[in-house]
Every structure is written in structure tokens, then in C-alpha cells.
Amino acid sequence: MLSGGAGSIPELNAQISVCRACPRLVDWREEVAVVKRRAFADQPYWGRPVPGWGSEQPRLLIVGLAPAAHGANRTGRMFTGDRSGDQLYAALHRAGLVNLPISMDAADGLQANQIRITAPVRCAPPGNAPTQAEWVTCSPWLEAEWRLVSEYVRAIVALGGFAWQIVLRLPGVSAMRKPRFSHGVVAQLYAGVRLLGCYHPSQQNMFTGRLTPAMLDDIFRDAKKLAGI
């Protein structure tokens, strides 16, 4: 098994960080880490798979897609160092779910308030588009993480339709009904756990107004309440 039967979050994070299972993703993440974007030319790049971040006993789990090439692939922390992350962490801060309004790097002092942020694909994919084979290969990592945190989770926010479908396939997850993904939709899962749909805070979604800060605030206000935080 790819996840190696990790017994704790730190052990799982260590295993994730050295995975080389997908040749295309390995080549891309490492090429980006060497070539770099001009704005970050003087900064070291993580250039490895990105583990989940946040509480090891989260009441709220946030599921994205994959690291950004010059965001999490650079900083080593989910949604950190790119515009999507700027929008996400600002909203989380307004909701009282993190202690800082922006996430700059892994040493910036950011702390989670009973939340965890993760993704079904751990390496930055070319064009932000992992192949089906890649996310299937990567899926044991999320499944292992889910086994370690699921007993604490009371609410899940899926950032985008892909994350929505992935959550519904997690071990032990079943919905009383499975509505199609849309922004603001809520699915009742097992034992009172709720799954909330949210448009991904991508640069395109934010710039076009498909997703606004107010819409993010509504989602995380509701998620916080459902999670009992």
C-alpha cells in the first residue's frame, strides 16, 4: 500500500513528502523548483509532495485539488503562497478558523483552529490538471489521512466539484442522498457529518465574480457552526 500503514499524522506527512509514484508529476514539480518564477528566483522551492496542514484532530476538513506550481510546491504548505490561498486564508481568518489573514510560508506562525486542509493530489500537476491515473495513484494518501482524522471531523468543505466527488468516495463515507455539486449545496453524510460544496477560490473564479469573499464567508460561517467550533 502506498501509504505504508502510517499510525500518525507526522508519520504520514513524512511518507507523503518522499513519494515518487507518478513520473510526470515528479518531473514537473522538480523542474518548476529549479527553473522557478522570476518573482521567486531567490527563494528555495519545496519541490516535493505536499502533506495536509492543520489540526491533527480537526472538526472541519477542507479538501482542495492539488498544490499550485509556485504556491504550495514552493512553500511546502497547502494553499500557501498563491492567490487562491490568499483568498482562502483571508476567509478562514474572518471566520476565526486561523490566527492570521494571510499564509506566506511554512514558518509564518499560522495556526489552525480545529481545521485541516488537504488535497487528493499531493504534487503540482502541469496546467493544474492531474490525470485520472495520477489521482487514483495518489488516493491512498488521502484515504490514510482520512482514517487518522475521520473520528474527529464533523463537517467537510469541498473546494470544487472534483473535491466533492473525491470526498464521497472516501472509506466509510456514505450520503443519505448524493446531490450534484454546486456552491452552497450540503450533503448529509454518516453520523451527522455534513459535506458543503464551495467553488474553488481560484484566480479565475474570484476575478470573474463567480466566487466572492462574501460567498466564502457564508460557507465558512456555516461550516464552523456545523463543525461545532
Swiss-Prot record:
<keyword id="KW-0408">Iron</keyword>
<keyword id="KW-0227">DNA damage</keyword>
<feature type="binding site">
    <location>
        <position position="22"/>
    </location>
    <ligand>
        <name>[4Fe-4S] cluster</name>
    </ligand>
</feature>
<dbReference type="InterPro" id="IPR036895">
    <property type="entry name" value="Uracil-DNA_glycosylase-like_sf"/>
</dbReference>
<dbReference type="GO" id="GO:0004844">
    <property type="term" value="F:uracil DNA N-glycosylase activity"/>
</dbReference>
<keyword id="KW-0234">DNA repair</keyword>
<keyword id="KW-0004">4Fe-4S</keyword>
<dbReference type="InterPro" id="IPR005122">
    <property type="entry name" value="Uracil-DNA_glycosylase-like"/>
</dbReference>
<dbReference type="GO" id="GO:0046872">
    <property type="term" value="F:metal ion binding"/>
</dbReference>
<keyword id="KW-0479">Metal-binding</keyword>
<feature type="binding site">
    <location>
        <position position="138"/>
    </location>
    <ligand>
        <name>[4Fe-4S] cluster</name>
    </ligand>
</feature>
<dbReference type="Pfam" id="PF03167">
    <property type="entry name" value="UDG"/>
</dbReference>
<keyword id="KW-0378">Hydrolase</keyword>
<comment type="similarity">
    <text>Belongs to the uracil-DNA glycosylase (UDG) superfamily. Type 5 (UDGb) family.</text>
</comment>
<keyword id="KW-0411">Iron-sulfur</keyword>
<feature type="binding site">
    <location>
        <position position="19"/>
    </location>
    <ligand>
        <name>[4Fe-4S] cluster</name>
    </ligand>
</feature>
<dbReference type="GO" id="GO:0051539">
    <property type="term" value="F:4 iron, 4 sulfur cluster binding"/>
</dbReference>
<dbReference type="InterPro" id="IPR044147">
    <property type="entry name" value="UdgB-like"/>
</dbReference>
<comment type="function">
    <text>DNA glycosylase with broad substrate specificity.</text>
</comment>
<dbReference type="InterPro" id="IPR051536">
    <property type="entry name" value="UDG_Type-4/5"/>
</dbReference>
<protein>
    <recommendedName>
        <fullName>Type-5 uracil-DNA glycosylase</fullName>
        <ecNumber>3.2.2.-</ecNumber>
    </recommendedName>
</protein>
<dbReference type="GO" id="GO:0033958">
    <property type="term" value="F:DNA-deoxyinosine glycosylase activity"/>
</dbReference>
<dbReference type="GO" id="GO:0006284">
    <property type="term" value="P:base-excision repair"/>
</dbReference>
<feature type="binding site">
    <location>
        <position position="123"/>
    </location>
    <ligand>
        <name>[4Fe-4S] cluster</name>
    </ligand>
</feature>
